[in-house]
């Protein structure tokens, strides 16, 4: 718990814990939910084989991953997956991203791959010539009126989190405490936010 408190003071988008044990995963899910929903920190975590049914959890579900130099456990390889997602520009998706270092992993047929994606799993698969990532989904499976299918997509959640963080940071750094809380000044902030959203739309 002390380590998690220290981690939470840093600014980051994706977290992995390569030494995590199975009995710690539920605690991590609760921790991520708490910060995303109550503490204004839109973090995500890559966890090995854990169906968190939550947009803030990436369920990396391979059983083993082999490179030329080492065979990795799923937990160990979550760092690679977190880095891959975090390093993917928001203009593209991590879907089918190649992993050139992988020479073997657990394999499934196309129907099984589709089922895994529908179960909220993100995994490495072999297309017959190379190893690459599956469709880039998070672990959210149960959709609701407030969280529909878009929330299942890693890229869409990343974009929503970026917008949330940008607007919150702008309000804190440039408006709150800098201007009187009048109607006109609120309109200035709304205008700035609207301009930001239009700029994103143009991109």
Task: Label every PLM stretch briefly.
Residues 1-97:
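Extracellular Cys-Trp
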């Amino acid at each position: 718990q002390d380590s998690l408190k220290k981690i939470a003071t840093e600014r980051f988008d994706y977290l992995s814990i390569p030494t995590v044990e199975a009995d710690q995963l539920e605690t991590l899910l609760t921790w991520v939910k708490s910060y995303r929903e109550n503490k204004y920190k839109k973090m995500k975590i890559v966890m090995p084989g854990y169906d968190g049914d939550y947009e803030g959890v990436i369920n990396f579900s391979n059983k083993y991953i082999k490179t030329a130099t080492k065979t990795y456990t799923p937990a160990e390889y979550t760092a690679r997956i977190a880095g891959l997602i975090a390093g993917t520009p928001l203009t593209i998706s991590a879907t089918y991203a190649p992993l050139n270092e992988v020479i073997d992993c657990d394999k499934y047929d196309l129907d099984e791959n589709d089922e895994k994606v529908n179960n909220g799993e993100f995994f490495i698969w072999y297309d017959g010539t190379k190893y690459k990532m599956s469709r880039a989904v998070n672990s959210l499976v149960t959709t609701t009126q407030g969280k529909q299918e878009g929330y299942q997509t890693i890229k869409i959640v990343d974009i929503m989190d970026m917008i949330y963080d940008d607007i919150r940071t702008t309000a804190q750094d440039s408006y709150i405490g800098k201007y009187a809380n009048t109607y006109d000044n609120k309109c200035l902030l709304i205008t700035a936010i609207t301009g930001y959203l239009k700029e994103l739309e143009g991109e």
